[in-house]
């Protein structure tokens, strides 16, 4: 991972200090940069995609997007509106089903979820015990977006609550994704 640049796109509430995204950023500060949203707790889609685009416009080297949860949908909505030759791929972890989740009814503008082939390679990693999307729905997203799909089993929402720590499995999957 040290020879590539990464832009992390956290989801609702951002990624706290025990989240694998934060741990990866702290271990590789020269290679990782986080998109900072205006409001992490009251997400508005057009604001989130504009903040992502601001960061993408600053890129000077080819970069991979590493998105978690609502950050994954931010990437998809961004790609539906913008493009950049600097984006080499998107690593999309636990995209939520905002169209069918009552837990996420307060978020604004993320529904409907775009259904088009992303203009860069992408990988969705999902869990069979994610409370924000069924494994079947995550697989539907992969088909719609032209993404590879990996089911990693019972890992919850693949966040700090999943007790993944540095998420070595995720690092290995990212390295495999980059090298294909």
Set out the residue ranges of the language-model regions.
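Catalytic histidine neighborhood in serine/cysteine hydrolases
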Residues: 31-33, 143-159
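Gly/Ala-rich beta-loop-alpha elbow adjacent to hydrolase catalytic centers
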Residues: 65-76
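Active-site catalytic motif of lipid deacylating hydrolases and related acyltransferases
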Residues: 2-61
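Catalytic histidine-centered segment of alpha/beta-hydrolase-like enzymes
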Residues: 43-46, 155-166
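Short beta-strand/loop motif that positions the catalytic acidic residue
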Residues: 118, 123-126, 130
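Conserved alpha/beta-hydrolase "acid-adjacent" motif
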Residues: 17, 131-137
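Catalytic active-site module of serine/aspartate enzymes centered on a nucleophile-bearing elbow/loop
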Residues: 58, 163-180
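Active-site nucleophile loop of the alpha/beta-hydrolase fold
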Residues: 11, 36-40, 90-100
């Amino acid at each position: 991972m040290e020879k590539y640049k990464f832009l992390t796109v956290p989801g609702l509430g951002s990624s706290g200090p025990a989240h694998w995204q934060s741990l990866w950023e702290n271990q590789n500060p020269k290679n990782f940069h986080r998109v900072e949203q205006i409001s992490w707790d009251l997400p508005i889609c057009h604001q989130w995609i504009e903040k992502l685009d601001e960061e993408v416009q600053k890129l000077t080297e080819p970069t991979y997007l590493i998105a978690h949860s609502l950050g994954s949908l931010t990437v998809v909505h961004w790609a539906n509106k913008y493009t950049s030759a600097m984006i080499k791929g998107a690593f999309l972890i636990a995209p939520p089903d905002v169209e069918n989740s009552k837990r996420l009814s307060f978020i604004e503008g993320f529904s409907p979820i775009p259904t088009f082939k992303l203009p860069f390679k992408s990988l969705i990693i999902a869990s069979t015990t994610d409370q924000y999307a069924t494994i079947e729905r995550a697989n539907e997203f992969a088909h719609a977006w032209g993404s590879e799909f990996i089911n990693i089993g019972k890992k919850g929402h693949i966040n700090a609550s999943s007790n993944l720590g540095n998420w070595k499995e995720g690092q290995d999957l990212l390295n495999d994704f980059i090298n294909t």
